[in-house]
């Protein structure tokens, strides 16, 4: 059975640790784009190009192959960060990706915290907008047609988090 899981949430919520452990336990390939930080400030257009050309291409691959994957950030990040940081985006492509991923049965996991004050990101733009980013993730969870699990990670209990995700994606 195909499993497409997207871990997407505010910075410093443990997405990478959760994704790697979920991959270890399920055998589903984990993927994180290592280039996103290279372009975050230098070329904001990178992200709109990524959703237009890379994410649509990769979604076609998922549709035709039946492959399973755990993605550490994906197109939902563009929905949130373009709004939070005032970047140009392409809502039409985001709507298309959402529709196609809903048809795939994609599960989106949004880890979040009740307090972000102890955590600092590498980018001041993120630190200055963390409350807005959090709120936009909550808005996204209502907007998307995909299955969404909003998961509080204040306790940083990786075993509980992965167990909760596994129960959600297996339901």
Where do the language-model regions lie?
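Conserved phosphate-donor/acceptor-positioning beta-strand/loop module used by diverse small-molecule
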Residues: 71-74, 90-121
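A mobile, often basic/glycine-rich helix-loop segment
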Residues: 79-95
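Pre-Walker A (Motif I) flank of P-loop NTPase domains
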Residues: 1-4
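Conserved substrate/cofactor phosphate-moiety recognition/catalytic segment
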Residues: 10-13, 20-65
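Conserved P-loop NTPase "ATPase switch" module shared by AAA+ and STAND
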Residues: 67-79
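NTP-dependent small-molecule kinase module
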Residues: 125-171
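Short, solvent-exposed loop/turn segments at secondary-structure junctions
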Residues: 11-13, 75-77, 114-117, 155-157
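Hydrophobic anchor at the beta1->P-loop junction of P-loop NTPases
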Residues: 7
């Amino acid at each position: 059975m195909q499993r497409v899981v997207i871990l997407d949430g505010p910075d410093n919520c443990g997405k990478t640790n959760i994704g790697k452990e979920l991959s270890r336990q399920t055998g589903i390939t984990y993927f994180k784009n290592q280039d996103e930080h290279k372009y975050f400030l230098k070329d904001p257009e990178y992200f709109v190009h990524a959703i237009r050309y890379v994410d649509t291409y990769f979604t076609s691959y998922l549709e035709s192959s039946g492959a399973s994957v755990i993605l550490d950030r994906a197109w939902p990040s563009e929905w949130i960060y373009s709004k939070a940081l005032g970047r140009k985006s392409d809502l039409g492509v985001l709507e298309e990706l959402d529709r196609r991923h809903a048809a795939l049965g994609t599960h989106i996991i949004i880890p979040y915290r009740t307090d972000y004050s102890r955590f600092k990101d590498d980018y001041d733009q993120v630190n200055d907008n963390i409350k807005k980013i959090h709120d936009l993730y909550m808005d996204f969870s209502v907007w998307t047609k995909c299955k969404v699990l909003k998961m509080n990670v204040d306790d940083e209990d990786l075993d509980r988090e992965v167990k909760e995700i596994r129960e959600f994606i297996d339901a």
